Amino acid sequence: MVADVLLTHFNQLFCLNDPGHPLTGQEMKKATIVEDGYIAIKDGLIVALGSGEPDAELVGPQTIMRSYKGKIATPGIIDCHTHLVYGGSREHEFAKKLAGVSYLDILAQGGGILSTVRATRSASFDNLYQKSKRLLDYMLLHGVTTVEAKSGYGLDWETEKRQLDVVAALEKDHPIDLVSTFMAAHAIPEEYKGNPKAYLDVIIKDMLPVVKEENLAEFCDIFCEKNVFTADESRYLLSKAKEMGFKLRIHADEIASIGGVDVAAELSAVSAEHLMMITDDGIAKLIGAGVIGNLLPATTFSLMEDTYAPARKMIDAGMAITLSTDSNPGSCPTANMQFVMQLGCFMLRLTPIEVLNAVTINAAYSVNRQERVGSLTVGKEADIAIFDAPNIDYPFYFFATNLIHQVYKKGQLTVDRGRIL
């Protein structure tokens, strides 16, 4: 087979044998590091991988050849938890945060999520589209090729649908692949204050059926947290969403452990997000149900909290984990997955191999794209992040700098030395 593109002489390729399930426990510690590696691409797919000189049959008169001495290649990075589409920003709350006002106290004062809800409701489709596109461009420049994007800053049907429509439009227009999550249960809107059940009934009866019918989202999510939605309320919504055919995610055990992990396990959610306050019993329940723990260390960093999710304990117990940005305008205003990956080492005490497995193959399972992306594997799409680094440890050791040299998306050179092509 003659390749369309042949990428050669990488210092290292980060490869693994996809076992057909999210990596857990000791599997998280393993990878195949190919020295002097090459990747052959045809029709947007990886058709060969190896070390040294490529087989002659891969090279034809039209094959594009590129050498990458001094560089490493990983699968395209996957950010599987973002709140991509929103209006406004919340830097006006930053001084309060520095003064020690808590996240929930800011929310109780009408700020936080509710502040962004007001800004998003007043924002046009074009405004939301352009703002979200800029974030996606930034992510792409940092090596991200697939992104999960939630609604949840409308809390009414008109605005929630506008957010989902923006995600759908960007999925068509932008190189990054987007996976849509419906999260109207992100907070209790002011017009339903004191009556969350009535709001959940509106979501179940009036919103979810349309989202499913128009294929606007693949996943449904809810914020199960003190002063937001209880475990029983979360179970009520997610069980109805599951009956309608949605895959499930849940924000759980972020600030307090109130039963969200139990709901995730009972309903076999694909992932439980945050988990800073998870208990040993909660970890055991998620392992037993096969729920992926999606950890968001940049949120803990941004909130200036001391308690990070117990990633080391999770892995050692046999749990599958991912890492994501939680990109949003309040609790985590960043879109930099490289920073998150570095926090995975510095604050969660994970190794570079564990982090790379978390943000590639496990993240692919978290967004149900494991058949297409998440590993440098023959037959998968050629989503490739190329780092200006001599080995896979270097991008973690040399922190706070964008080390992306190039990005390939479906076999096309999409980012080249700080420019989107």
UniProtKB/Swiss-Prot annotation:
It is an enzyme of class 3 (hydrolase). One of its GO terms (biological process) is L-histidine catabolic process to glutamate and formamide. Keywords: Cytoplasm, Histidine metabolism, Hydrolase, Iron, Metal-binding, Zinc. The keyword Ion transport does not apply. Pathway: Amino-acid degradation; L-histidine degradation into L-glutamate; N-formimidoyl-L-glutamate from L-histidine: step 3/3. Fe(3+) binds at residues 81, 83, 251, 326. Transmembrane segments: none annotated. One of its GO terms (cellular component) is cytoplasm. GO terms for molecular function: imidazolonepropionase activity; iron ion binding; zinc ion binding. Zn(2+) binds at residues 81, 83, 251, 326. 4-imidazolone-5-propanoate binds at residues 90, 153, 186, 254, 331. The keyword Cytoplasm applies. It comes from the Bacteria. Its EC number is 3.5.2.7. InterPro entries: Amidohydro-rel, HutI, Metal-dep_hydrolase_composite, Metal_Hydrolase. Catalyzes the hydrolytic cleavage of the carbon-nitrogen bond in imidazolone-5-propanoate to yield N-formimidoyl-L-glutamate. It is the third step in the universal histidine degradation pathway. This is Imidazolonepropionase. The gene is hutI.
